[in-house]
């Protein structure tokens, strides 16, 4: 893959504000979007069945996920052996989405994009911004629509006709009929669809053998599933036997349109020629929510990334200049994290000594004084943030426009970033001087303030994709480099 190009800060701003390329409808990107008529119709199962079957033919299968989700891409990576990249025009930009897709497909033989929710469901009820349809239009990709047929016969015609005609710019190339019962049920469905001449490119029967386990934040991550090889084997068989491959294969073949130059999605300042700062990345079953782009950006800026496990190690890696705690499920592993007292003590000492630290969501929970889990049990955590984090029944979810009210080593006063919240915990005691003032997508007024900034610790529930705010990553690496060479 070509190395990432570096540019000046003025060029960063110019690229991020450039409008997306409008592609001629005569030009087709290589690849296919898997969409659902709503959530829960089997979109992820279909996606994984196709990916695992393709991966048995080729080692160059590139997948993408629409939206900010972390867990579905973990399954993609298990299926293909390659990182799955998120396509999110709110967290990044339309231009970034196009460039990311083009760049990551350069060496791919097949490309597949898994959608989010229903085909036209996005960040607003007034438009389909950030929806699967939005991404399909940006990339000029055909759509394979997955329909749950478990309680349908002729009504399937109305559903598919509506999805095909709502937006003529979105090309529904075929459908997958999921959860089909008997042969008679399939006959009723195919008879109903005969009048609109829509290709039926897959039929999946009702079965529970390939159900993916889930819990309070969606699917259980792959790191907690020792049975994942068996699941993928069954999915591969499903993929090989339930789809019309002569029609699907050319749709999935990767290529790029000539109107859009293939260029890397990340434009960053050249990094210093001085030795790389070493940043420890907490990566285990408790902390696993990382966008691959974020890690790529840190590397591009000159950082050396050191993966490590707070669950398995009593000390952070030696000779480090920064810490990065992503989100995850510390509440599930609270007992193990609490039992590692030696590590908690060492981390508190290092963070109080101004070791640059970036913590999102689950990382914030770990740095708090106490974590109260789903059963109401209290567990001691690192104790850098003066608050108790408590699991709640209410899900906090959605895009946020965040305006900086308390500048720190990463963020400037009044700087605006877009992030995403997705958690079922809350802090009993809010930050005394919150980093961010938050506003929901499309809202006129702010609704909340949150985020901690203590010494060189930044901790927030907000998940950021640094493709949309590379200056944050730049500031983090600069702080780590400065820490390395402090007197």
Where are these predicted regions, by residue range?
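Extreme N-terminal, non-catalytic leader segments
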Residues: 3-14, 18-36
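ATP-dependent carboxylate-amine ligase catalytic core
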Residues: 25-139, 147-174, 183-187
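Structural motif
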Residues: 33, 112-114, 144, 176, ...
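C-terminal and late-domain segments of enzyme folds
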Residues: 136, 287-300, 304-305, 394-487
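Internal gly/pro-rich beta-alpha loop/helix module
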Residues: 153-271
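Acyltransferase
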Residues: 222-275, 283-287, 449-487
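Phosphate-binding active sites in nucleotide-utilizing proteins
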Residues: 277-341, 345-350
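Cysteine-nucleophile active-site neighborhood
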Residues: 330-408
